[in-house]
Amino acid sequence: MASKYGSGVLPENKKEKGDKETPETSYSSQSVSVNTLADQVSSTLSFAPSSDSKTGGEVKFNEKSDQSGKSNTCRPSTSSDISDESTCSSFSGNNKPHKANDVRWEAIQAVRTKHGVLGLNHFRLLKRLGCGDIGTVHLAELHGTRCFFAMKVMDKGALASRKKLLRAQTEREILQCLDHPFLPTLYSHFETEKFSCLVMEFCPGGDLHTLRQRQPGKRFSEQAAKFYVAEVLLAMEYLHMLGIIYRDLKPENVLVRDDGHVMLSDFDLSLRCTVSPTVVRSTVLASEGQKNSGYCAQPACIQQPSCISAPTTCFSPRYFSSKSKKDKKMKNETGNQVSPLPELVAEPTSARSMSFVGTHEYLAPEIIKGEGHGSAVDWWTFGIFLYELLFGKTPFKGSGNRATLFNVVGQPLRFPESPVVSFAARDLIRSLLVKEPQHRLAYKRGATEMKQHPFFEGVNWALVRCASPPEIPKPVDYESAPATPAAATSTSVKSDQSNYLEFDFF
């Protein structure tokens, strides 16, 4: 599992992720130059002793070349200096609209204005939050401020020897493109002679895997699960609009912010491709929806977002005062006379990849069978994700990794007798966990189709950020976080990486 930006340490029983990779054809390898901060690394980037090193193995599979065109939304950068910003055509520099009200952006900009560049010497590392396959994440404080960040530190030498420089570059370039309330903010990135660092948003609530373990029965209520998956769905919709296939959705990668809302993390396995957003009339969309689901997908049957009505929660059915049958009939007749609004569909359906990447319990059948895959793998993992939140386990887990893979391909979906969940929840999971991707819910219309499913009835998509989260994390006591003593940086990073195992299954 890749590194976390949250506060909790990494449990030993977390699921295993796989991807042994070869360079993808459309990317250039990253060259690294020596910079003036090289002499400061040993004294600045030091690690405190920690017991959070991961003992479970991340299983890596053979990754073949991807056959999709790369999006020009974010072009790969061949420069490698200590610059905090790089080239990203959509959102670069100060063009991200949500920077304005963030005090952390102001603090970062103040340091840049004063010193010209931002580097390791401007941060105080407080403690290690977790470690992953390509780096270690630390809680860091910007000197002279009360601004805290999650800093991901990657040993470039170790990445090069393990042929993972491309993954680190891919993650950085994707993070530079993102500007969404449920996706991470990359405040800065810089490099030293030995290390590549990403300065990101810190999520004190840990991840959904850890939070689920604390729930009664180690599972979420259906209402809580609906809250989390709705926010994840909006994040996935945004990623697909940018031509980014996530490929690593699981509770461990969904972090909880201080306000209880969530944030997706870890994009080193993501695939970038071309996408062509299309505006389609709802009448066409509804007819397609009826073919793929037993539910009515007519716009009149689907609750549309509204910024006018303000329910106390965005995740509860709305109740209206009773009206006479005559009034209801007149309303229906009026509604039938109004043409439904067109809908935006931005699903990268043409993307194809032969990469064998992901976590065993979340791998889609088409990945395991080596048939090539596209954006539909994200909707398969979405179904596994919802299943795990509701039932406390994944549906195809076997006695071992090989058995799990065989179950994904050959075993039918089964629901446990307990806990009892709604028919709509089961139907959504069943529609997503279809082994043939072309018959899977959201295969053509993506999140647009998902939002219309009855499981999300009562969700006001325009006001999701106004909803009350199921749980608010306890405030973090930053004062009690011990400062890191001097230690050998390279030794600590190599120590973390030695905890990862690589296996070949095929």
From Swiss-Prot:
Disruption phenotype: No visible phenotype under normal growth conditions, but the quadruple d6pk, d6pkl1, d6pkl2 and d6pkl3 mutants are deficient in lateral root formation and mildly agravitropic, have fused or single cotyledons and narrow and twisted leaves, form few axillary shoots, are almost infertile and impaired in phototropic hypocotyl bending when exposed to lateral white light. Residues 77-92, 480-492 have a biased composition (Low complexity). It comes from the Eukaryota. One of its GO terms (molecular function) is ATP binding. Residues 12-23, 55-67 have a biased composition (Basic and acidic residues). The active site is at residue 248. The keyword DNA repair does not apply. This is Serine/threonine-protein kinase D6PKL1. It comes from Arabidopsis thaliana. The lineage of its organism: Eukaryota, Viridiplantae, Streptophyta, Embryophyta, Tracheophyta. The gene is D6PKL1.
